[in-house]
């Protein structure tokens, strides 16, 4: 078996976010790390929309990310710490739209190791030095400088190691232009390590240590170290030099402390708590992330607590000595991994879980009536301030970036009967959890819909002048009339436009600088800007059947075969070319390209004929309408469209969009593509040679059951093609790649580009008798999603086969059930009433009632933390088509759903489905202790509209996995595998196997075989012998694997994903037998007594691959109608991908050679060796990396040609191969 790994949706979770001026202009950008890829975003300061400039795989794990600027520089650089054992400095090149490596210095081994630096970064605020630290012992400092050409240089590393020291965080201290200084949170564990009693460990204190880099001596010294009272989790650097007092803010549990060297004494302020909080009162409060905003005149800090509350922190100074810390509640947003305050007035919040947000900072919170807390306010030790959370007041949400992370599990199914399967994904944590239904397609925003008096057959938009920014008219053609609408604040009908309204229109367009042209069956109207009209009438009884128009040319067909060509002269008149051309067959469609800049005409006309050919005719005045080339088609052409794609005029993208070989030429022009829509629903894309007119390199895609109609529109400043069949598709070029993506919208019939003040790049389209104005904002998106909120973290789900409804198990740790929450609120309210004196009793009663009635949405304000060992669970039935919860079954406090299965019991003989739910009671995670578990059985109503509770079976272990098996229930109870049958009062235990080593986490069954996954010992192959009623292990794996997901590929083959980001496929060799009777040696009888270490037969590992993210679900499924099966996976970070099988050894050899060349020619950006990355835990075997192969599309033309030459191919052939393998299985 040979597999090819394809990423369908890149990771959406964010691990690091930094902002800066990476492109060198005045614009602010945000650089995100998504674990193993980097993504550059640019928020539009006018609209607030976030645009993705580029996304690049680094084939490594990003551990740390910082932005810095050299003193006096105009752009920011990026320094990346990864698992490569190298420090890498990157620069964004806007002209190539790529991140380029400026420096790469090796300092240690590869991999995420505790003593290899790269986990922590600290930058001197003036950009003169960087310190890079490991979790333990090692720290290195590098000095940044410029050479004579003003290029960035980096020094040799200076060591600042200290043995037996753990580092928690480090920052660069702002000391102006004094020697660079770095502050570190450290713990020295030497004494604790030597003391066997553990007393020293209890006494160990965290220290704040300052390291100074002496630029004169080129040496790092430990300048100062001080023990801390509270355990701190991170540091915030305070502006220094001329801008502020310098020093650091130490964020620790319940306290915020300011420290600095010299005469400064410590300033300490408690972290405010929410008033009347339901949280466990013993639980401390910490800050989890921060953002600093500084201008020449002021600075402030935004710090966020783990509940999501943001506080604005300011420091009061007296002669550069800090005298007071002031805190003010700012707003509440979802808890974040990183926050960035941009100079354009935006706050970017990269959420820990769920979607990421961009907010406009509307107010700084200085003038509101929110109380301000201060370190100078007198408080007893251990007391704190209280505040009341509220809805957003200072922030305004302007954009949202969808994120699926964390994906808990997923399933491919076609519950909506749409032919194309949907992906049902359980995402999120706690009250921000969602079920998301993902469909392949672009999200469409409907700007306007209006009914028309009849069913139109075509629509166009035109500008009055060529240099106008927006369109002036929408022209709608009916069977016997033409309607002209003017575009302004509203869309209204006009009658004085010069268009003929009493006839249908075949085509209309802007002509020249300021004229319009209308082609109708009886002639051509040329409407000048002063409303003069020149008409050309069709001769005799002939009528115009087809036409093609651009800015300077008009081509028409008379009565089917005769071609007439018009061209505009310098005076603006439309002149007919003297000779007409007769085609050998009836003309079905025609297309002209746009006139290139600086040219007088488009040089070629494409004509589709009824004889199943498309012909290219020259429009050169010297040999006008002479054939240049011809291409035979499998069926008649329905429509043609000539577009220039693969280059950029884009202002939004801010970078060069160029693709494969064909696009690259010295003048940075794109390639001319002829798109051919066939009557059988197939779209062909062919490259048109701009000199000879030859057609080459044809690509094919099936779009739908209807004939394909094509329309040229503008997307992000570049040309794109809208293709309409039974679904509407958009073919466009984005981030160095061609995309052909369906629109998630109903069927359209005709369309044109649309541009107005409200919608600069839209589409105007017709569907039956309605006119629609649409906008596409999320170009590059793979999936269009619909999200349905859930209450607790979803754990697993099953789909009811008869109704398609979903039964979802939701369970949260550290949470209250609704009943417990109400009881706790009532208890706190009663305490408020009883604590009040006689004169305050009425006020206390009002406050208690207000507290009980107050409902803060938990998806924003977080749910209360109940304490360790407290669980809340429920079973939800959801109609995934409409997102409607049919019913929910809440469980009592401290019952946690661990597993769930839907099955039919053969003994019940009612043909009904039953739901088995595995529950743990009073589970404590660390150490793992519980009061046992139970299996609840529910009978499912045939319409899945209710669950009937049958009975509960108590067991002494936690039921970690359940599975239906031959009309009975297989249960993994701790490390015991049991078969239960249905009983009247409880489940009846029929059979047991005690030889799984640790804990069963997954069970699959097929035929007489059971495939059982252990938490850390991979998969066991078990045979059920019905005659002896025995479960016998007959084979197992040779390697330990910490299993997260499995799926069966066939009777002998299973795919396994583990906690370290690996996928492996295990297959039983032909020699393995699962029948004990065939073994004459009698050794198999020993397994049952557990005398051998594992089974005597072993599975073979046939595929291994390191994905780099924890795979949470695996499924063998098809993603496109008529496509082949692939192994679909979803990861914790939000990635959706597929392992697709090679159908021939020849294809495998081709891609293996391409991968090998790409490793050499385009090594990973952050210095990790690609082969060692994909072999991080087990050597990569029989799996090729499609992500690396597809980078071929975006490397330089010279490298493309070199690789193609070495492989005895052309660059176009390689690009076609890459496109074909993707479209055969996925999208």
From Swiss-Prot:
<dbReference type="Pfam" id="PF03178">
    <property type="entry name" value="CPSF_A"/>
</dbReference>
<dbReference type="Pfam" id="PF23726">
    <property type="entry name" value="Beta-prop_RSE1_2nd"/>
</dbReference>
<dbReference type="InterPro" id="IPR050358">
    <property type="entry name" value="RSE1/DDB1/CFT1/CPSF1"/>
</dbReference>
<dbReference type="GO" id="GO:0005686">
    <property type="term" value="C:U2 snRNP"/>
</dbReference>
<dbReference type="GO" id="GO:0005634">
    <property type="term" value="C:nucleus"/>
</dbReference>
<keyword id="KW-0508">mRNA splicing</keyword>
<comment type="function">
    <text>Involved in pre-mRNA splicing as a component of the splicing factor SF3B complex, a constituent of the spliceosome. SF3B complex is required for 'A' complex assembly formed by the stable binding of U2 snRNP to the branchpoint sequence (BPS) in pre-mRNA. Sequence independent binding of SF3A/SF3B complex upstream of the branch site is essential, it may anchor U2 snRNP to the pre-mRNA. May also be involved in the assembly of the 'E' complex. Also belongs to the minor U12-dependent spliceosome, which is involved in the splicing of rare class of nuclear pre-mRNA intron.</text>
</comment>
<dbReference type="InterPro" id="IPR036322">
    <property type="entry name" value="WD40_repeat_dom_sf"/>
</dbReference>
<dbReference type="GO" id="GO:0000398">
    <property type="term" value="P:mRNA splicing, via spliceosome"/>
</dbReference>
<dbReference type="InterPro" id="IPR004871">
    <property type="entry name" value="Cleavage/polyA-sp_fac_asu_C"/>
</dbReference>
<dbReference type="GO" id="GO:0030532">
    <property type="term" value="C:small nuclear ribonucleoprotein complex"/>
</dbReference>
<comment type="similarity">
    <text>Belongs to the RSE1 family.</text>
</comment>
<dbReference type="InterPro" id="IPR018846">
    <property type="entry name" value="Beta-prop_RSE1/DDB1/CPSF1_1st"/>
</dbReference>
<dbReference type="InterPro" id="IPR015943">
    <property type="entry name" value="WD40/YVTN_repeat-like_dom_sf"/>
</dbReference>
<protein>
    <recommendedName>
        <fullName>Splicing factor 3B subunit 3</fullName>
    </recommendedName>
</protein>
<keyword id="KW-0507">mRNA processing</keyword>
<comment type="subunit">
    <text>Identified in the spliceosome A complex; remains associated with the spliceosome throughout the splicing process. Component of the spliceosome B complex. Identified in the spliceosome C complex. Identified in the spliceosome E complex. Component of the U11/U12 snRNPs that are part of the U12-type spliceosome. Component of splicing factor SF3B complex. Identified in the SAGA transcription regulatory histone acetylation (HAT) complex; the interaction is RNA-independent.</text>
</comment>
<dbReference type="Pfam" id="PF10433">
    <property type="entry name" value="Beta-prop_RSE1_1st"/>
</dbReference>
<dbReference type="GO" id="GO:0071011">
    <property type="term" value="C:precatalytic spliceosome"/>
</dbReference>
<keyword id="KW-0539">Nucleus</keyword>
<dbReference type="GO" id="GO:0071013">
    <property type="term" value="C:catalytic step 2 spliceosome"/>
</dbReference>
<dbReference type="GO" id="GO:0000124">
    <property type="term" value="C:SAGA complex"/>
</dbReference>
<keyword id="KW-0747">Spliceosome</keyword>
<dbReference type="GO" id="GO:0030620">
    <property type="term" value="F:U2 snRNA binding"/>
</dbReference>
